[in-house]
Amino acid sequence: MPILSKLNKRVRARVEEDDFEHFSLESASDGSELGEEDEEETDDSDGSGSDSDDGGGRDGDESENEDLESDSASSDANSDITSSLNNISFGALAKAQASLGKRKRSTTLTADIASKRRKSPTRSPPAPSSKEDQKYPNATRPPQKLSHRTSKHAPTIQSSRHAVTRKRTVIKPPAIPQARDPRFDSVVLNHSTNGNPSIATNATIHANKNYAFLNSYRTEELSQLRKRLQTLQQEKSKDTHDEREIERLKRQITSMSDRMRTFERKEMEREVLAGHRRKEREAIREGKKSQPWFLKKGDVKREVVTRRFTEMSGKEKQRALERRRKKVASKEKKEMPWARRGVE
């Protein structure tokens, strides 16, 4: 029978999936042919029924016989199909089901992707305005404005897109000569220590100790400059030359006094650190501590300020407090917005 032979062909195990598709298509076509034959038989039976109605009862027996024959033929075909299906192995059924499942999955995936592509809107680049075209006629894209810093302590924002300079350094300019004093140069002092690391690390301290007599020279020079300024200010006849000399002396006095003040501050910081280290060594030697405690820079500065304030006289304290008050007020004014500056 043709159906049984085709089903037996489908039962054979094949490696490639194209054979399964071919067999499935053939079986579908066979099923459609069977359906068409059944429809034709039903149509014929209907037609015969109509003829019997028209002709009378003489054709009724013939139509009944034809119906019985068609029913018996269809029952035989169904029994053949069921018997052939019972002979199919489970491996062939599993392979056929797997091939059909893969094809169905792939079709659903492609359909989903196509629907998503249809739904997703196409992003078109923003068209530049007329103002931007007038401002940047030759540029393809206008430069983006960088956002401002959150605070003055934040790092500066710089774009990574910047034009490379067209200039090229062919000959490097000579280095600017710097005046160096070998008495206070750290390189010279490190070489003169003969490889002693304890002395080499504290080269500046040893230099200050060796040339401590220069401080007395500076104080004498400062006193002479102040006397010279006082005599020029007391003179009645003042010309342009004297005024220029007075301004020069004032600048020199302020620079020398500031330099001496920094020397004193650094010396006081060294004394504070030396005293703290001495105390820590004694505490470790006595067994009160197992490890030393190192002061931070902020703690050292705070200790220096307290010492200087205790050593000042009454007038010096008032002057220092007034300077501090002005400094804090100017700092607050800088941080204040412009609208409040005008009101206050």
UniProtKB/Swiss-Prot annotation:
Function description: Component of the 90S pre-ribosome involved in the maturation of rRNAs. Required for early cleavages of the pre-RNAs in the 40S ribosomal subunit maturation pathway.
Pfam families in the record: RRP36
Protein name: rRNA biogenesis protein RRP36
Organism this protein belongs to: Paracoccidioides lutzii (strain ATCC MYA-826 / Pb01) (Paracoccidioides brasiliensis)
UniProt feature, compositional bias: Acidic residues: 33-54, 61-70
Any GO BP annotation: maturation of SSU-rRNA from tricistronic rRNA transcript (SSU-rRNA, 5.8S rRNA, LSU-rRNA)
Family from the record: Belongs to the RRP36 family.
Predominant localisation class: nucleus
Top-level taxon of the source organism: Eukaryota
Any one of the GO CC terms: 90S preribosome
Keyword vocabulary terms for this entry: Coiled coil, Nucleus, Ribonucleoprotein, Ribosome biogenesis, rRNA processing
Biased amino acid composition, Low complexity: 71-83
Region feature (Disordered): 15-83, 95-167, 311-344
Name of the coding gene: RRP36
